[in-house]
Amino acid sequence: MAYHSFLVEPISCHAWNKDRTQIAICPNNHEVHIYEKSGAKWNKVHELKEHNGQVTGIDWAPESNRIVTCGTDRNAYVWTLKGRTWKPTLVILRINRAARCVRWAPNENKFAVGSGSRVISICYFEQENDWWVCKHIKKPIRSTVLSLDWHPNNVLLAAGSCDFKCRIFSAYIKEVEERPAPTPWGSKMPFGELMFESSSSCGWVHGVCFSASGSRVAWVSHDSTVCLVDADKKMAVATLASETLPLLAVTFITENSLVAAGHDCFPVLFTYDNAAVTLSFGGRLDVPKQSSQRGMTARERFQNLDKKASSEGGAATGAGLDSLHKNSVSQISVLSGGKAKCSQFCTTGMDGGMSIWDVKSLESALKDLKIK
């Protein structure tokens, strides 16, 4: 486990480049900062300033090396590196509320933006007119879209929203791709087609994730539940009410294992039993370390004023937390190995810190932990 504190401000979202040498983060404002690793240090190399509202989503396309950002100013920008400068291209999303999340499609020929306008904007580049255009997925979304994730086939899109639903839509754009092959989710996939909708009312859906095979989708909700739907099991849904505070982010690390994190400030493991179609709690992944009590320095006291609105170091303010992160974890991303066999994943949090977790090290540190 490696932890680096970038900022006093919360990190609201992040994205990595292809070779994992650079990370783009939003310091909870209208800017995006790009840091590059140099030895054991992280040095700021770029600042992307074009939004005039808080940046709410970042995604970095690995092959084309383009960054897409969205924000509360209701716009998205596609950033292209020309020389040593990132050049922005405005994408008109045609929404009247804040954009909340953005994701490149696997083939990088389009991206999706979820918003408070109760729509998902599917944006693609129109060669004839030399600009980005978008189509809207509207029905039956009834509230803000908080999270998105793409199926490996580049067509299906999972969305979690504030109307307590996880849905899977077809985002097929005939202008930029061939007709998709049938999937376990369905064979007819015209644009905007609803392929799946969760029936349980479980709270705001903060995070969604497809498995590596694309036949499973997991989501986490504000009532501390974790759910998984398996298309190979006739859309059977496994639900687990966890004992944690609400989880904000989730990702598959194998076909049967999930890592999620949120307001408890540490990642937890969940395991899916394919035969029984059930989810079980696999354990906490952040091993508490016994540390001796000591006095606070003046520097730490001022940092606590910024991070926790308190100069005291008690448990209520987070200094007494035995977790690596001292505030809510806002995002999880797979660093190496992919969703099929993840070997490293990354978390960023509202404490302004970033942690890199090694799966094998976690397995050896936690003797009872077995990641299937």
Swiss-Prot record:
Tree of life domain: Eukaryota
GO molecular function: actin binding
Subcellular location: Cytoplasm, Cytoskeleton; Nucleus
GO BP: any one term: Arp2/3 complex-mediated actin nucleation
Main subcellular localisation: cytoplasm
Secreted keyword on record: no
Gene3D superfamilies in alphabetical order: YVTN repeat-like/Quinoprotein amine dehydrogenase
One annotated Gene Ontology cellular component of this protein: cytoplasm
SUPFAM superfamilies according to UniProt: WD40 repeat-like
Keywords assigned: Actin-binding, Cytoplasm, Cytoskeleton, Nucleus, Repeat, WD repeat
WD repeats: 6-45, 50-89, 94-135, 140-179, 242-280, 324-367
Subunit structure: Component of the Arp2/3 complex composed of ACTR2/ARP2, ACTR3/ARP3, ARPC1B/p41-ARC, ARPC2/p34-ARC, ARPC3/p21-ARC, ARPC4/p20-ARC and ARPC5/p16-ARC.
Role summary: Component of the Arp2/3 complex, a multiprotein complex that mediates actin polymerization upon stimulation by nucleation-promoting factor (NPF). The Arp2/3 complex mediates the formation of branched actin networks in the cytoplasm, providing the force for cell motility. In addition to its role in the cytoplasmic cytoskeleton, the Arp2/3 complex also promotes actin polymerization in the nucleus, thereby regulating gene transcription and repair of damaged DNA.
Family: Belongs to the WD repeat ARPC1 family.
Protein name: Actin-related protein 2/3 complex subunit 1B
